[in-house]
Swiss-Prot record:
Belongs to the ABC1 family. UbiB subfamily. GO terms for molecular function: ATP binding; protein kinase activity. The keyword Manganese does not apply. Is probably a protein kinase regulator of UbiI activity which is involved in aerobic coenzyme Q (ubiquinone) biosynthesis. Its EC number is 2.7.-.-. Pathway: Cofactor biosynthesis; ubiquinone biosynthesis [regulation]. This is Probable protein kinase UbiB.
Length: 557
Protein backbone atom coordinates (compact mmCIF):
# COMPACT_ATOMS: atom_id res chain seq x y z
CA UNK A 1 0.00 0.00 0.00
CA UNK A 2 2.84 2.39 0.89
CA UNK A 3 4.48 1.67 -2.47
CA UNK A 4 1.23 2.49 -4.30
CA UNK A 5 0.86 5.79 -2.40
CA UNK A 6 4.51 6.65 -3.07
CA UNK A 7 4.10 5.83 -6.78
CA UNK A 8 0.97 8.00 -7.01
CA UNK A 9 2.84 10.90 -5.40
CA UNK A 10 5.68 10.50 -7.89
CA UNK A 11 3.11 10.50 -10.70
CA UNK A 12 1.57 13.76 -9.45
CA UNK A 13 4.99 15.41 -9.26
CA UNK A 14 5.87 14.20 -12.79
CA UNK A 15 2.66 15.73 -14.15
CA UNK A 16 2.97 18.98 -12.21
CA UNK A 17 6.46 19.53 -13.61
CA UNK A 18 5.40 18.46 -17.12
CA UNK A 19 7.85 15.56 -17.29
CA UNK A 20 5.41 13.03 -18.78
CA UNK A 21 7.08 13.52 -22.19
CA UNK A 22 10.12 11.66 -20.80
CA UNK A 23 7.92 8.53 -20.55
CA UNK A 24 6.48 8.83 -24.04
CA UNK A 25 5.51 5.50 -25.59
CA UNK A 26 5.36 3.59 -22.28
CA UNK A 27 2.38 2.25 -20.27
CA UNK A 28 3.30 4.76 -17.56
CA UNK A 29 2.53 7.58 -19.99
CA UNK A 30 -0.96 6.15 -20.58
CA UNK A 31 -1.66 5.98 -16.83
CA UNK A 32 -0.39 9.52 -16.39
CA UNK A 33 -2.65 10.69 -19.23
CA UNK A 34 -5.65 9.26 -17.34
CA UNK A 35 -4.59 11.04 -14.13
CA UNK A 36 -3.77 14.35 -15.84
CA UNK A 37 -7.25 15.97 -15.45
CA UNK A 38 -7.05 15.47 -11.66
CA UNK A 39 -3.63 17.12 -11.19
CA UNK A 40 -3.30 20.94 -11.02
CA UNK A 41 -1.72 22.47 -14.13
CA UNK A 42 1.90 23.58 -13.93
CA UNK A 43 2.39 27.22 -13.03
CA UNK A 44 3.61 29.61 -15.71
CA UNK A 45 6.93 29.85 -13.87
CA UNK A 46 7.45 26.06 -14.00
CA UNK A 47 6.26 25.82 -17.61
CA UNK A 48 8.87 28.40 -18.67
CA UNK A 49 11.74 26.30 -17.26
CA UNK A 50 13.85 23.96 -19.40
CA UNK A 51 13.21 20.20 -19.14
CA UNK A 52 16.43 19.76 -17.15
CA UNK A 53 15.43 22.47 -14.65
CA UNK A 54 11.95 20.93 -14.30
CA UNK A 55 13.48 17.50 -13.61
CA UNK A 56 15.83 19.01 -11.01
CA UNK A 57 12.96 20.78 -9.20
CA UNK A 58 10.85 17.60 -9.26
CA UNK A 59 13.65 15.51 -7.72
CA UNK A 60 14.15 18.12 -5.00
CA UNK A 61 10.44 17.95 -4.17
CA UNK A 62 10.45 14.13 -4.04
CA UNK A 63 13.02 14.17 -1.25
CA UNK A 64 16.64 13.44 -0.35
CA UNK A 65 16.87 9.95 -1.87
CA UNK A 66 15.71 11.25 -5.25
CA UNK A 67 18.16 14.16 -4.93
CA UNK A 68 20.93 11.58 -4.51
CA UNK A 69 19.46 9.65 -7.46
CA UNK A 70 19.67 12.82 -9.60
CA UNK A 71 23.26 13.50 -8.53
CA UNK A 72 24.33 10.00 -9.51
CA UNK A 73 22.33 10.19 -12.75
CA UNK A 74 24.18 13.41 -13.63
CA UNK A 75 27.38 11.36 -13.92
CA UNK A 76 25.82 9.16 -16.64
CA UNK A 77 26.41 11.54 -19.53
CA UNK A 78 26.50 8.53 -21.80
CA UNK A 79 22.81 7.97 -21.06
CA UNK A 80 21.18 11.39 -20.65
CA UNK A 81 21.24 14.53 -22.81
CA UNK A 82 23.90 17.18 -21.97
CA UNK A 83 21.34 19.87 -21.01
CA UNK A 84 19.69 17.55 -18.47
CA UNK A 85 23.06 16.41 -17.07
CA UNK A 86 24.17 20.03 -16.56
CA UNK A 87 21.00 20.86 -14.60
CA UNK A 88 21.30 17.76 -12.42
CA UNK A 89 24.82 18.79 -11.36
CA UNK A 90 23.17 21.78 -9.64
CA UNK A 91 21.23 19.55 -7.22
CA UNK A 92 22.11 20.48 -3.65
CA UNK A 93 22.22 17.66 -1.10
CA UNK A 94 21.08 19.88 1.78
CA UNK A 95 18.09 18.88 3.89
CA UNK A 96 16.57 19.84 7.21
CA UNK A 97 18.69 18.45 10.09
CA UNK A 98 17.28 15.77 12.38
CA UNK A 99 17.16 16.19 16.15
CA UNK A 100 20.56 16.47 17.83
CA UNK A 101 19.47 14.27 20.75
CA UNK A 102 18.60 11.53 18.24
CA UNK A 103 22.13 11.91 16.83
CA UNK A 104 23.54 11.52 20.34
CA UNK A 105 21.61 8.25 20.82
CA UNK A 106 22.80 6.89 17.44
CA UNK A 107 26.43 7.65 18.37
CA UNK A 108 26.04 5.96 21.76
CA UNK A 109 24.55 2.80 20.19
CA UNK A 110 27.26 2.75 17.49
CA UNK A 111 30.20 3.18 19.88
CA UNK A 112 28.72 1.27 22.82
CA UNK A 113 29.61 4.17 25.13
CA UNK A 114 27.76 7.16 26.57
CA UNK A 115 28.61 10.31 24.61
CA UNK A 116 29.72 11.91 27.90
CA UNK A 117 32.41 9.20 28.20
CA UNK A 118 33.44 9.02 24.54
CA UNK A 119 33.74 12.81 24.15
CA UNK A 120 34.66 15.71 26.40
CA UNK A 121 32.10 17.79 24.46
CA UNK A 122 29.49 17.00 21.79
CA UNK A 123 27.52 19.78 20.07
CA UNK A 124 23.95 18.62 19.34
CA UNK A 125 23.54 21.43 16.77
CA UNK A 126 24.89 20.02 13.47
CA UNK A 127 27.53 21.81 11.40
CA UNK A 128 25.99 20.45 8.18
CA UNK A 129 23.11 18.19 7.19
CA UNK A 130 22.63 16.05 4.06
CA UNK A 131 20.31 13.30 2.84
CA UNK A 132 22.33 10.39 4.27
CA UNK A 133 24.00 11.84 7.37
CA UNK A 134 24.78 14.99 9.30
CA UNK A 135 27.96 16.27 10.96
CA UNK A 136 28.46 17.39 14.58
CA UNK A 137 31.41 19.13 16.22
CA UNK A 138 32.94 17.37 19.23
CA UNK A 139 36.05 17.28 21.43
CA UNK A 140 37.93 14.16 22.50
CA UNK A 141 38.84 13.57 26.16
CA UNK A 142 42.33 14.84 27.10
CA UNK A 143 45.23 12.65 25.95
CA UNK A 144 48.34 11.73 27.97
CA UNK A 145 49.65 15.29 27.51
CA UNK A 146 46.36 16.85 28.59
CA UNK A 147 45.46 18.01 25.05
CA UNK A 148 41.81 17.98 23.94
CA UNK A 149 41.56 17.29 20.23
CA UNK A 150 38.82 18.86 18.09
CA UNK A 151 36.95 16.38 15.90
CA UNK A 152 33.81 16.10 13.78
CA UNK A 153 31.37 13.19 14.03
CA UNK A 154 29.38 12.11 10.97
CA UNK A 155 26.13 10.40 12.01
CA UNK A 156 23.74 8.42 9.79
CA UNK A 157 20.11 9.57 9.75
CA UNK A 158 17.68 7.42 11.78
CA UNK A 159 15.82 4.79 9.68
CA UNK A 160 17.66 5.95 6.54
CA UNK A 161 18.24 2.33 5.45
CA UNK A 162 14.51 1.55 5.49
CA UNK A 163 13.70 4.71 3.51
CA UNK A 164 16.38 3.94 0.92
CA UNK A 165 15.27 0.29 0.60
CA UNK A 166 11.67 1.37 -0.04
CA UNK A 167 12.64 3.97 -2.66
CA UNK A 168 15.14 1.63 -4.35
CA UNK A 169 12.50 -1.13 -4.55
CA UNK A 170 10.17 1.34 -6.25
CA UNK A 171 12.94 2.44 -8.64
CA UNK A 172 13.62 -1.22 -9.51
CA UNK A 173 9.93 -1.67 -10.38
CA UNK A 174 9.93 1.49 -12.51
CA UNK A 175 13.18 0.41 -14.21
CA UNK A 176 11.71 -2.99 -15.09
CA UNK A 177 8.64 -1.28 -16.55
CA UNK A 178 10.75 1.14 -18.60
CA UNK A 179 13.01 -1.69 -19.83
CA UNK A 180 10.00 -3.66 -21.09
CA UNK A 181 8.18 -0.78 -22.74
CA UNK A 182 10.47 2.14 -23.59
CA UNK A 183 11.61 2.21 -27.26
CA UNK A 184 15.15 3.29 -26.24
CA UNK A 185 15.51 0.94 -23.27
CA UNK A 186 18.62 -0.74 -24.76
CA UNK A 187 20.39 2.64 -24.75
CA UNK A 188 19.07 3.87 -21.38
CA UNK A 189 19.69 0.53 -19.58
CA UNK A 190 17.42 1.52 -16.64
CA UNK A 191 18.04 -1.53 -14.45
CA UNK A 192 21.80 -1.03 -14.76
CA UNK A 193 21.42 2.63 -13.72
CA UNK A 194 19.30 1.71 -10.68
CA UNK A 195 21.77 -1.03 -9.69
CA UNK A 196 24.60 1.52 -9.85
CA UNK A 197 22.62 3.95 -7.69
CA UNK A 198 21.85 1.18 -5.20
CA UNK A 199 25.53 0.25 -4.98
CA UNK A 200 26.60 3.86 -4.44
CA UNK A 201 24.00 4.45 -1.73
CA UNK A 202 24.89 1.17 0.01
CA UNK A 203 28.54 2.24 0.14
CA UNK A 204 27.57 5.62 1.63
CA UNK A 205 25.53 3.90 4.36
CA UNK A 206 28.65 2.24 5.82
CA UNK A 207 30.63 4.97 7.57
CA UNK A 208 33.33 2.50 8.60
CA UNK A 209 33.98 1.90 4.91
CA UNK A 210 34.16 5.66 4.35
CA UNK A 211 36.70 5.84 7.17
CA UNK A 212 38.79 3.16 5.44
CA UNK A 213 38.66 5.20 2.20
CA UNK A 214 39.89 8.29 4.06
CA UNK A 215 42.65 6.29 5.73
CA UNK A 216 43.95 4.91 2.40
CA UNK A 217 43.85 8.34 0.73
CA UNK A 218 45.66 9.90 3.71
CA UNK A 219 48.41 7.27 3.45
CA UNK A 220 48.99 8.10 -0.23
CA UNK A 221 49.26 11.86 0.50
CA UNK A 222 51.04 11.79 3.86
CA UNK A 223 53.37 14.80 4.13
CA UNK A 224 52.23 16.29 0.80
CA UNK A 225 52.19 20.04 0.14
CA UNK A 226 49.38 19.54 -2.38
CA UNK A 227 46.62 17.67 -0.53
CA UNK A 228 45.71 17.10 3.12
CA UNK A 229 43.38 14.31 4.28
CA UNK A 230 41.98 14.45 7.85
CA UNK A 231 42.94 11.62 10.19
CA UNK A 232 40.31 9.00 11.06
CA UNK A 233 39.82 8.47 14.82
CA UNK A 234 39.26 4.72 14.67
CA UNK A 235 38.55 4.37 18.40
CA UNK A 236 35.44 6.53 17.85
CA UNK A 237 34.31 5.12 14.49
CA UNK A 238 31.68 2.48 13.68
CA UNK A 239 29.25 1.62 10.87
CA UNK A 240 26.83 4.44 11.80
CA UNK A 241 29.27 7.00 13.23
CA UNK A 242 32.54 8.29 11.73
CA UNK A 243 34.92 10.52 13.70
CA UNK A 244 37.56 12.59 11.89
CA UNK A 245 40.02 15.23 12.95
CA UNK A 246 38.47 18.69 12.53
CA UNK A 247 40.01 20.81 9.78
CA UNK A 248 39.54 24.45 8.86
CA UNK A 249 39.60 25.82 5.35
CA UNK A 250 37.93 27.86 2.63
CA UNK A 251 35.60 26.23 0.04
CA UNK A 252 37.50 26.07 -3.25
CA UNK A 253 34.79 28.02 -5.11
CA UNK A 254 34.77 30.98 -2.68
CA UNK A 255 37.09 33.16 -4.76
CA UNK A 256 36.46 36.30 -2.66
CA UNK A 257 37.60 34.59 0.56
CA UNK A 258 40.60 33.02 -1.17
CA UNK A 259 41.68 36.44 -2.46
CA UNK A 260 41.14 38.02 0.97
CA UNK A 261 43.39 35.31 2.46
CA UNK A 262 46.08 36.07 -0.15
CA UNK A 263 45.98 32.56 -1.65
CA UNK A 264 47.88 32.10 -4.94
CA UNK A 265 44.92 30.87 -7.01
CA UNK A 266 46.98 30.20 -10.13
CA UNK A 267 49.31 27.83 -8.27
CA UNK A 268 46.32 26.23 -6.55
CA UNK A 269 44.49 25.55 -9.84
CA UNK A 270 47.52 23.80 -11.36
CA UNK A 271 47.93 21.73 -8.18
CA UNK A 272 44.31 20.57 -8.40
CA UNK A 273 44.84 19.14 -11.89
CA UNK A 274 48.13 17.49 -10.86
CA UNK A 275 46.54 15.95 -7.76
CA UNK A 276 43.71 14.44 -9.82
CA UNK A 277 45.95 12.84 -12.45
CA UNK A 278 48.29 11.55 -9.74
CA UNK A 279 45.37 9.97 -7.87
CA UNK A 280 44.13 8.27 -11.03
CA UNK A 281 47.38 7.10 -12.64
CA UNK A 282 49.86 6.76 -9.75
CA UNK A 283 47.67 5.70 -6.81
CA UNK A 284 44.67 4.28 -8.71
CA UNK A 285 42.46 5.64 -5.91
CA UNK A 286 40.68 8.89 -6.69
CA UNK A 287 38.14 11.06 -4.88
CA UNK A 288 35.04 10.64 -7.05
CA UNK A 289 32.85 13.32 -5.46
CA UNK A 290 35.27 16.21 -5.87
CA UNK A 291 32.89 19.19 -6.12
CA UNK A 292 33.77 22.50 -4.46
CA UNK A 293 31.88 21.64 -1.25
CA UNK A 294 34.12 18.61 -0.67
CA UNK A 295 37.37 20.31 -1.67
CA UNK A 296 38.58 23.07 0.67
CA UNK A 297 41.75 25.14 0.68
CA UNK A 298 43.99 25.23 3.77
CA UNK A 299 43.50 28.62 5.45
CA UNK A 300 46.90 28.56 7.21
CA UNK A 301 48.48 32.02 6.50
CA UNK A 302 51.89 30.37 6.04
CA UNK A 303 50.52 28.48 3.03
CA UNK A 304 49.42 31.50 1.00
CA UNK A 305 52.12 31.09 -1.65
CA UNK A 306 52.25 27.30 -1.45
CA UNK A 307 48.52 26.51 -1.04
CA UNK A 308 47.19 23.08 -0.20
CA UNK A 309 43.82 21.42 -0.80
CA UNK A 310 41.88 19.63 1.95
CA UNK A 311 39.71 16.65 0.95
CA UNK A 312 36.37 15.97 2.67
CA UNK A 313 33.66 13.30 2.34
CA UNK A 314 35.11 9.96 1.26
CA UNK A 315 31.89 8.02 0.60
CA UNK A 316 32.52 7.68 -3.15
CA UNK A 317 36.01 6.71 -4.30
CA UNK A 318 37.02 5.44 -7.73
CA UNK A 319 39.47 2.81 -8.97
CA UNK A 320 40.26 1.60 -12.49
CA UNK A 321 41.53 -1.75 -13.68
CA UNK A 322 45.21 -1.73 -14.71
CA UNK A 323 44.12 -2.14 -18.33
CA UNK A 324 41.74 0.82 -18.20
CA UNK A 325 44.43 2.92 -16.48
CA UNK A 326 46.90 2.18 -19.27
CA UNK A 327 44.44 2.68 -22.13
CA UNK A 328 43.07 5.90 -20.64
CA UNK A 329 46.57 7.37 -20.19
CA UNK A 330 47.48 6.34 -23.74
CA UNK A 331 44.20 7.84 -24.96
CA UNK A 332 45.03 11.19 -23.36
CA UNK A 333 48.50 11.13 -24.93
CA UNK A 334 46.96 10.31 -28.32
CA UNK A 335 44.67 13.34 -27.89
CA UNK A 336 47.69 15.53 -27.07
CA UNK A 337 49.45 14.29 -30.23
CA UNK A 338 46.28 14.45 -32.42
CA UNK A 339 46.85 10.77 -33.25
CA UNK A 340 43.27 9.84 -34.17
CA UNK A 341 44.24 6.44 -35.57
CA UNK A 342 45.80 5.46 -32.25
CA UNK A 343 42.73 6.75 -30.37
CA UNK A 344 40.50 4.49 -32.48
CA UNK A 345 42.80 1.48 -31.99
CA UNK A 346 42.90 2.04 -28.22
CA UNK A 347 39.11 2.01 -27.95
CA UNK A 348 39.09 -1.45 -29.54
CA UNK A 349 42.18 -2.80 -27.73
CA UNK A 350 40.68 -1.75 -24.39
CA UNK A 351 37.58 -3.83 -25.08
CA UNK A 352 35.35 -0.75 -24.93
CA UNK A 353 34.21 -1.49 -28.49
CA UNK A 354 33.61 -4.69 -30.50
CA UNK A 355 36.64 -5.98 -32.42
CA UNK A 356 34.78 -5.95 -35.75
CA UNK A 357 34.33 -2.16 -35.75
CA UNK A 358 35.91 -0.35 -38.72
CA UNK A 359 38.97 1.50 -37.41
CA UNK A 360 38.91 4.04 -40.26
CA UNK A 361 35.30 5.02 -39.43
CA UNK A 362 36.15 5.35 -35.74
CA UNK A 363 39.25 7.39 -36.64
CA UNK A 364 37.11 9.78 -38.71
CA UNK A 365 34.62 10.10 -35.84
CA UNK A 366 37.43 10.92 -33.38
CA UNK A 367 38.81 13.53 -35.79
CA UNK A 368 35.39 15.18 -36.12
CA UNK A 369 35.12 15.45 -32.32
CA UNK A 370 38.64 16.69 -31.55
CA UNK A 371 39.56 19.02 -34.42
CA UNK A 372 37.08 21.79 -33.46
CA UNK A 373 38.64 21.90 -29.98
CA UNK A 374 42.14 22.47 -31.33
CA UNK A 375 41.03 25.75 -32.94
CA UNK A 376 40.25 27.21 -29.49
CA UNK A 377 42.71 28.93 -27.15
CA UNK A 378 44.36 26.36 -24.86
CA UNK A 379 42.72 27.94 -21.80
CA UNK A 380 39.28 27.05 -23.22
CA UNK A 381 39.96 23.40 -24.01
CA UNK A 382 38.40 20.84 -21.65
CA UNK A 383 39.84 17.32 -21.61
CA UNK A 384 36.70 16.12 -19.83
CA UNK A 385 34.47 17.50 -22.59
CA UNK A 386 36.65 15.90 -25.28
CA UNK A 387 36.53 12.53 -23.50
CA UNK A 388 32.76 12.69 -22.94
CA UNK A 389 32.10 13.63 -26.58
CA UNK A 390 34.43 10.87 -27.80
CA UNK A 391 32.56 8.29 -25.74
CA UNK A 392 29.20 9.69 -26.86
CA UNK A 393 30.15 9.46 -30.55
CA UNK A 394 31.56 5.97 -29.96
CA UNK A 395 28.14 4.86 -28.67
CA UNK A 396 27.08 4.62 -32.31
CA UNK A 397 29.58 1.74 -32.55
CA UNK A 398 28.27 -0.16 -29.49
CA UNK A 399 30.59 1.39 -26.90
CA UNK A 400 30.62 -0.45 -23.54
CA UNK A 401 31.99 1.46 -20.54
CA UNK A 402 32.56 0.32 -16.97
CA UNK A 403 30.85 2.46 -14.27
CA UNK A 404 34.25 3.47 -12.86
CA UNK A 405 35.22 5.11 -16.18
CA UNK A 406 31.95 7.03 -16.18
CA UNK A 407 32.66 8.09 -12.59
CA UNK A 408 36.08 9.31 -13.71
CA UNK A 409 34.52 11.43 -16.49
CA UNK A 410 32.32 13.21 -13.95
CA UNK A 411 35.22 13.73 -11.53
CA UNK A 412 37.45 15.13 -14.29
CA UNK A 413 34.65 17.53 -15.23
CA UNK A 414 34.36 18.67 -11.58
CA UNK A 415 38.13 19.11 -11.21
CA UNK A 416 38.37 21.15 -14.40
CA UNK A 417 35.43 23.28 -13.22
CA UNK A 418 37.12 23.99 -9.88
CA UNK A 419 40.42 24.70 -11.65
CA UNK A 420 38.84 27.18 -14.08
CA UNK A 421 37.04 28.96 -11.22
CA UNK A 422 40.37 29.44 -9.49
CA UNK A 423 42.25 30.41 -12.66
CA UNK A 424 40.10 31.20 -15.74
CA UNK A 425 43.24 31.04 -17.93
CA UNK A 426 44.29 27.60 -16.68
CA UNK A 427 45.85 25.56 -19.49
CA UNK A 428 44.76 22.10 -18.36
CA UNK A 429 46.62 20.40 -21.22
CA UNK A 430 49.94 22.03 -20.30
CA UNK A 431 49.55 20.96 -16.65
CA UNK A 432 48.26 17.43 -17.35
CA UNK A 433 50.68 16.42 -20.10
CA UNK A 434 53.97 16.37 -18.11
CA UNK A 435 52.20 14.60 -15.23
CA UNK A 436 50.94 11.88 -17.58
CA UNK A 437 54.32 11.54 -19.30
CA UNK A 438 56.13 11.22 -15.97
CA UNK A 439 53.63 8.71 -14.60
CA UNK A 440 53.81 6.58 -17.77
CA UNK A 441 57.64 6.67 -17.64
CA UNK A 442 57.67 5.63 -13.98
CA UNK A 443 54.94 3.04 -14.46
CA UNK A 444 56.88 1.13 -17.11
CA UNK A 445 60.44 1.75 -15.85
CA UNK A 446 62.69 -1.33 -15.33
CA UNK A 447 62.89 -0.59 -11.59
CA UNK A 448 59.09 -0.64 -11.23
CA UNK A 449 58.72 -3.76 -13.41
CA UNK A 450 61.34 -5.60 -11.34
CA UNK A 451 59.65 -4.40 -8.15
CA UNK A 452 56.30 -5.79 -9.36
CA UNK A 453 57.95 -9.08 -10.30
CA UNK A 454 59.62 -9.33 -6.91
CA UNK A 455 56.28 -8.65 -5.19
CA UNK A 456 54.72 -11.49 -7.19
CA UNK A 457 57.69 -13.81 -6.68
CA UNK A 458 55.88 -16.31 -4.38
CA UNK A 459 53.08 -16.69 -6.96
CA UNK A 460 55.62 -17.00 -9.80
CA UNK A 461 57.65 -19.62 -7.89
CA UNK A 462 54.46 -21.62 -7.28
CA UNK A 463 53.44 -21.75 -10.95
CA UNK A 464 56.89 -21.69 -12.65
CA UNK A 465 57.39 -25.52 -12.57
CA UNK A 466 54.16 -25.99 -14.56
CA UNK A 467 55.08 -23.52 -17.32
CA UNK A 468 57.21 -25.79 -19.59
CA UNK A 469 54.51 -28.50 -19.57
CA UNK A 470 51.72 -25.98 -20.27
CA UNK A 471 53.67 -24.26 -23.07
CA UNK A 472 54.54 -27.61 -24.68
CA UNK A 473 50.90 -28.74 -24.45
CA UNK A 474 49.63 -25.49 -25.97
CA UNK A 475 52.16 -25.54 -28.83
CA UNK A 476 51.34 -29.18 -29.55
CA UNK A 477 47.63 -28.35 -29.82
CA UNK A 478 48.41 -25.44 -32.15
CA UNK A 479 50.59 -27.57 -34.40
CA UNK A 480 47.97 -30.32 -34.59
CA UNK A 481 45.27 -27.78 -35.32
CA UNK A 482 47.37 -26.18 -38.07
CA UNK A 483 48.00 -29.55 -39.82
CA UNK A 484 44.26 -30.18 -39.87
CA UNK A 485 43.61 -26.87 -41.66
CA UNK A 486 42.56 -27.52 -45.28
CA UNK A 487 43.69 -24.64 -47.49
CA UNK A 488 40.96 -24.14 -50.11
CA UNK A 489 41.08 -20.45 -51.02
CA UNK A 490 43.17 -17.32 -50.95
CA UNK A 491 41.19 -16.16 -47.90
CA UNK A 492 42.07 -19.34 -46.02
CA UNK A 493 45.71 -18.96 -47.06
CA UNK A 494 45.66 -15.45 -45.63
CA UNK A 495 44.08 -16.84 -42.47
CA UNK A 496 46.77 -19.52 -42.28
CA UNK A 497 49.48 -16.86 -42.64
CA UNK A 498 47.86 -14.77 -39.91
CA UNK A 499 47.70 -17.78 -37.60
CA UNK A 500 51.38 -18.55 -38.19
CA UNK A 501 52.31 -14.95 -37.41
CA UNK A 502 50.14 -15.10 -34.31
CA UNK A 503 51.82 -18.31 -33.18
CA UNK A 504 55.26 -16.74 -33.70
CA UNK A 505 54.19 -13.71 -31.66
CA UNK A 506 52.78 -15.89 -28.89
CA UNK A 507 55.92 -18.05 -28.71
CA UNK A 508 58.10 -14.91 -28.61
CA UNK A 509 55.90 -13.39 -25.90
CA UNK A 510 55.95 -16.61 -23.83
CA UNK A 511 59.75 -16.79 -24.16
CA UNK A 512 60.04 -13.15 -23.08
CA UNK A 513 57.72 -13.74 -20.12
CA UNK A 514 59.73 -16.80 -19.11
CA UNK A 515 62.99 -14.83 -19.20
CA UNK A 516 61.41 -12.11 -17.05
CA UNK A 517 60.32 -14.79 -14.57
CA UNK A 518 63.92 -16.06 -14.46
CA UNK A 519 65.13 -12.48 -13.87
CA UNK A 520 62.67 -12.04 -11.01
CA UNK A 521 63.63 -15.38 -9.44
CA UNK A 522 67.35 -14.50 -9.58
CA UNK A 523 66.60 -11.06 -8.14
CA UNK A 524 64.64 -12.60 -5.27
CA UNK A 525 67.19 -15.35 -4.48
CA UNK A 526 70.22 -13.00 -4.22
CA UNK A 527 72.70 -15.50 -5.80
CA UNK A 528 76.47 -15.27 -5.48
CA UNK A 529 78.31 -13.62 -8.35
CA UNK A 530 78.56 -10.25 -10.02
CA UNK A 531 76.09 -7.46 -9.28
CA UNK A 532 75.24 -4.24 -11.12
CA UNK A 533 73.92 -1.95 -8.42
CA UNK A 534 71.72 -4.15 -6.21
CA UNK A 535 70.64 -6.43 -9.08
CA UNK A 536 72.55 -9.61 -10.16
CA UNK A 537 74.16 -9.32 -13.61
CA UNK A 538 72.39 -12.49 -14.80
CA UNK A 539 69.11 -10.94 -13.71
CA UNK A 540 69.89 -7.89 -15.89
CA UNK A 541 70.79 -10.13 -18.86
CA UNK A 542 67.70 -12.33 -18.50
CA UNK A 543 65.43 -9.32 -17.91
CA UNK A 544 66.90 -7.45 -20.88
CA UNK A 545 66.47 -10.44 -23.19
CA UNK A 546 62.91 -10.98 -21.94
CA UNK A 547 62.02 -7.31 -22.43
CA UNK A 548 63.49 -7.41 -25.95
CA UNK A 549 61.43 -10.51 -26.79
CA UNK A 550 58.24 -8.87 -25.52
CA UNK A 551 59.03 -5.71 -27.49
CA UNK A 552 59.54 -7.77 -30.68
CA UNK A 553 56.21 -9.55 -30.07
CA UNK A 554 54.49 -6.19 -29.58
CA UNK A 555 56.05 -4.65 -32.73
CA UNK A 556 54.84 -7.62 -34.81
CA UNK A 557 51.18 -6.80 -34.07
Amino acid sequence: MKAILRASRIGRVILRYRLDALLEGTPAERWLRLAKPFVPRASAEIAAQSRGARLRLALQELGPIFVKFGQILSTRRDLIPPDVAEELTLLQDRVKPFDGEAARLIVERALGLPVSVAFAAFDTTPLASASIAQVHAATLPPDANGLRREVVVKVLRPDIERQIDADIALLHSLATLVERTHPRADKIRPREVVAEIEGTLSAELDLQREGANASVLRRFWEGSDDLYVPEVIWSHTAERALTLERVYGIPSDDVAKLDAAGIDRKALAAKGVRVFYTQVFRDNFFHADAHAGNIWVDSDPERRLNPRFIALDFGIMGQLSQEDQYYLAENFMAIFHKDYRRMAELHVEAGWMPSNVRIDELEAAARSVCEPYFTRPLSEISLAEVLIKLFRVAQRYELTLQPQLILLQKTLLNIEGVGRQLDPKLDIWAVARPVLERILRERYSPRRVLGELRKRLPEIMTHAPDMPRLVHSWLKQQVEGRHQLDIRSSELRALDLSLRKLQTRVVTAITGSGLLVVAAVLYGLHPDGWYLGTVPVWSWISGGAGSAALLIAWLRR
